[in-house]
Amino acid sequence: MKVSRSIALVGGAVMFSVAGPAIASAAAAPRGEHGGSTVVGQVYVNDNTVGANTVAGYDRHADGSLTPLPGSPFATGGAGSGGGLGSQGALQVSPDGRYLLAVDAGSNQISVLRIKGDGRLVLAEGGVVSSGGIKPVSVAITERADRNDLVYVANGGVGGEDYTGFTFSESGRLRPLSGSTFALPDGSAAGDVLFNGDGSTLAGTRDGTSQIDSFTVDRGGRLHAAPGSPFTGQGLGQIGAEFRPTNDDQLFVSNAHNGPGLGTVSAFHVGRNADLTSIGDGPYADQQTAPCWVEISHDGRFLFTTNTAQPSVSTYAIARNGTLTLVGSTPLDATLQKGPTDLRLSPNGTVLYVLTAGGHAITTFAVDGGSLTPLGALTALPAGSSPVGIVVV
C-alpha cells in the first residue's frame, strides 16, 4: 500500500494523509458521539509501560471508530516491562464486565481495575497483587456460579515460570489459591493461558519449547495435567490459542516460528481428560510469516490470526469437525501497521480491532463473515507504551 507523507491538521487532530489508513491522535469529540456515531462500548489496551504501567481506554462508536476516554491512560499501580511479551491475553475482562485484569510484567504483579459506568478505570481496592512468579505475560478468568471466579496467570520469566491460580470475588479482590502453582521449566517462555467455556479445562502455550499444556480443573480450582501433557506442537513457537466458542472440545493454536511464508495454525480435539489429538491433516498453512495471535468469530465459523512479520491478518473457515480452510489474507501497511499482535472482535462480531504494536496503533476492520474491510483512520496509542493485550467491551 502506497503511503503519502503529507500531514494536515484536522479539527485539532494530527492526520497523516494516506492512500489507505491514517493515524489520528484522536482529538476529543463530545462524549457519546464521533462524526455522529454514538458510543456503544469501550476498547482497552495494556500499555506495558516501563516503570509505571497504564491501560489506555477508548470509547467505541457504532461505526467502529475510537476516541480516547477522559483521563486515559489509567495507572495500574504496577510496572510494565517496556518491551514485547510475546504473549496473548495480557489484559482480560471479568465475566460480569465490571473489572479488567492486567499483567504488570516489570513488577511481577497483576492489577485489577474497576470499569466505571462511563468506561473510565480506577484501581480496585487492594488491586495490585503478586503474580506468583516472574514476568506475568497472560491471564485467564472463568466464571463459577457457586463460588468466586477462578483466575490463572502464566508467568514467563526465568527463575519463576509457572501457572498460578487465584480466586476473584464480586468486589474485585484477587486472592492466591493455595496449592495451585504448576511450575514450568526455565526456557518455556509461556505464551498464553486460557480456559474453555465452562472452565473445566485450562490450556497453556510454551513458545520457547514449542509445547502445549492441557489440564482438567477440579472443583477447588487446582490443575491436573492431561495424560501426555505437555504436548509437542505441530511446528515451532506456540503463542496464541483459542477454544472454539461453539465447541469446547476444539482448540486452535498458532505456530509462529516455522520461517518465512511457512506459518501454520493447528487444530486439536480436546478429550474428557483434556488430552489433545490432532484434527484432520493439520497443521494448516496460512502462507504467511509468524502467525502469532488468534481470534475466533463468536459463531465459531471463522478464525483470524495476525502474521506479525508479514504484516497481515489471515482468515480460515472452520468446518463443523474443526478442520481449517484458508480463506485468504488481508495485507496491512508495512509502515503504519507493522507488527500486528493481539486482536479482538466487538461483542456483535462486526468489527475487528487489531493491535499493531510496531506501528503503535489500533487497526480497525469491518467483518462480514470471513471478509475484512479497513475502517477509517488508525487510532494512536499513548507515547512510550509497549502495547500488549486488548479487550473490547
Label the model's feature ranges.
Residues V18-G41, N48-T49, R222, G369:
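C-terminal region of N-terminal signal peptides and the immediate post-cleavage residues
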Residues Y58-L66, V112-L121, G165-L174, S214-L223, ...:
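Short loop/turn segments immediately following beta-strands, especially the blade-tip
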